Amino acid sequence: MVLSPKQEEELRFAVADYLQSCGYTNALEAFKKDASIPKEIDNKKYSGLLEKKWTSVVRLQKKVMDLELRLNNTTREMNSGVPTRNSRSSNDWIPRPPEKHSLSGHRSPITCVVFHPVYNVMVSSSEDASMKIWDYESGDFERTLRGHTDSVQDLAFDSSGKLLASSSADMTVKIWDFQTFECRMTLRGHDHNVSSVCFLPSGDFLLSSSRDKTIKMWEVATGYCVYNFEGHREWVRRVAVASDGSLMASCSNDQTVRIWSLSSKECKEELRGHEHVVECIKWAPESCNRYINEASGTEVPKGQKSGPFLASGSRDRVIKIWDVTTAVCLFSLVGHDNWVRGLAFHAGGKYLTSASDDKTIKIWELRHKRCSKSLEAHNHFVTTIDFHRSSPFVITGSVDLTIKVWECR
């Protein structure tokens, strides 16, 4: 490698400074004479420069080694016959490294990412009190939505994608018109942080859960609170509605999951088994039923339907799969080294993906109850994950302030 005259001068003076700082007097004098260096050296300018250059080289070497490892793994996958997206069923597509896009723009940790149900855009929310809209295919930033005065905790679209709901630590829920990007209404009534929000399938009602230990049902047209669900003994972290709109699930700091009837408004079941705060829940689509039945050894008589099934993730590092009808935990998925923060089912039903504070996302093959792939996804806690219902993309968000788009194949 050929150094420029300026680089040569920097190197000579940096070596001289190093010899001087180490007390190598004889070597220093000889080096000064051979390298034509004046007797006096500007200590401030060159102090520690050689050590800094050396540590920079070490860091770059490590980065190169990491990149080489990722390249080798990708090459090995291709050469060992891992099917490409064109040659395998979409039911078998799973996210693979490296990420397609790494999106930056938020000034504080990412709290939620969600795909739009129709358009090729996604929305992210952050502790910086803002929401950002991105084109997940191109990676382009489109616009920022502002209105909350504290951390935005959760996001949800209605089935048409015309409305976006956001919940916040400012104790409010906002409903946004996703065509004009204006806040249509602000829902007030919770007494603490509103940690979760979701629409009922009809789009007529909205549910929100809060640190005030309650779940509220809101009429979307009027913004009125029409019912207040009580039963959890601590912070209600998440609320989720079954695809047919008949049942609601909620999870809490009280280490339980509750199943509620939305017609009678009664708590039907309390699911116990986790040993710490239950951070997240997700209803399994019907496409998962056959794989969950195989995994649990359940034989379903002809003409009968199984399920519904629910997944829960906890700070105890465990994911549990529940039969909601019997209130039984069918099996547990163990493998994360830290809190489980997010869950998303593959639309094809074979896989469940999870996000964790161990900085990874894991892809679980439900039939065999095993982790089939683990991705080092972020440089800090992975707080949220979403799996597109029809396109081959997964998105994740992290405390490292980035959102990543992963392509599936």
Swiss-Prot record:
The keyword Cell division applies. Residues 7-39 form the LisH domain. Residues 56-81 form a coiled coil. GO terms for biological process: cell division; establishment of mitotic spindle orientation; microtubule organizing center organization; microtubule sliding; nuclear migration; vesicle transport along microtubule. InterPro entries: Dynein_regulator_LIS1, G-protein_beta_WD-40_rep, LIS1_N, LisH, PAC1-like_LisH-like_dom, WD40/YVTN_repeat-like_dom_sf, WD40_repeat_CS, WD40_repeat_dom_sf. It comes from the Eukaryota. SMART domains: LisH (SM00667), WD40 (SM00320). It is found in: Cytoplasm, Cytoskeleton; Cytoplasm, Cytoskeleton, Microtubule organizing center, Centrosome. Dimerization mediated by the LisH domain may be required to activate dynein. PANTHER family: WD REPEAT DOMAIN 5B, WD40 REPEAT PROTEIN. This is Lissencephaly-1 homolog. It comes from Trichoplax adhaerens.
